[in-house]
């Protein structure tokens, strides 16, 4: 089964990412909740890269590679856009966002809650986000 995909940085390609992750995960007997959480986390990172790092520039690309390491799945999403500076990130109060009806700004916080480990790296001009999830 193919375990990598490359898409142009257009929001219309987010469905392609979600479908690809769902198809890949279908080989494993995951609960529907876990499957949907993983798809949500990968979709959120891909959306952030498309919108914020690459300014929805369809001439730019991001790549997703999925691999299994023992009991853990690794989702590696890479691009050549503006790198995410985790040191500048302040986790929002999700309950407060809900209470006041604020939209947006909680994606990374949700990803942090869903995945076991989240890493942001830069190697040369390539930015990499690694999402780890133990499911086996």
Predicted regions and their residues:
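Flexible, glycine-/charge-rich segments associated with ATP-binding catalytic modules
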Residues: 1-5, 112-136
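Helix-loop-beta hinge of the Bergerat
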Residues: 2-32
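Conserved short strand/loop->alpha-helix "switch" segment adjacent to the catalytic nucleotide/phosphoryl-transfer site
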Residues: 21-43, 100-102
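Conserved polar catalytic motif of the HATPase_c/GHKL fold
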Residues: 44, 48, 113
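Short helix-loop "hinge" at the ATP-lid/N-box region of the Bergerat-fold HATPase_c
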Residues: 49-54
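Short beta-strand/loop element within the Bergerat-fold HATPase_c
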Residues: 61-71
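Glycine-rich/acidic phosphate-handling loop/turn and adjacent ATP-lid/helix
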Residues: 75-103
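Glycine-rich phosphate-binding loop
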Residues: 100-115
């Amino acid at each position: 089964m193919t375990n990598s995909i490359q898409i142009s940085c257009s929001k219309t390609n987010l469905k392609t990412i979600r479908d690809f992750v769902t198809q890949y995960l279908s080989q494993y007997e995951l609960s529907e909740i876990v499957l949907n959480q993983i798809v949500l986390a990968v979709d959120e990172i891909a959306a952030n890269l498309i919108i914020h790092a690459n300014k929805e520039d369809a001439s730019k690309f991001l790549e997703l590679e999925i691999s299994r390491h023992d009991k853990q799945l690794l989702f590696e999403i890479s691009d050549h856009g503006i790198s995410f500076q985790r040191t500048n990130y302040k986790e929002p109060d999700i309950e407060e966002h809900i209470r006041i009806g604020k939209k947006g700004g909680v994606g990374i916080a949700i990803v942090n809650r869903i995945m076991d480990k989240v890493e942001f790296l830069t190697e040369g001009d390539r930015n990499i986000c690694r999402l780890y999830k133990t499911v086996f």
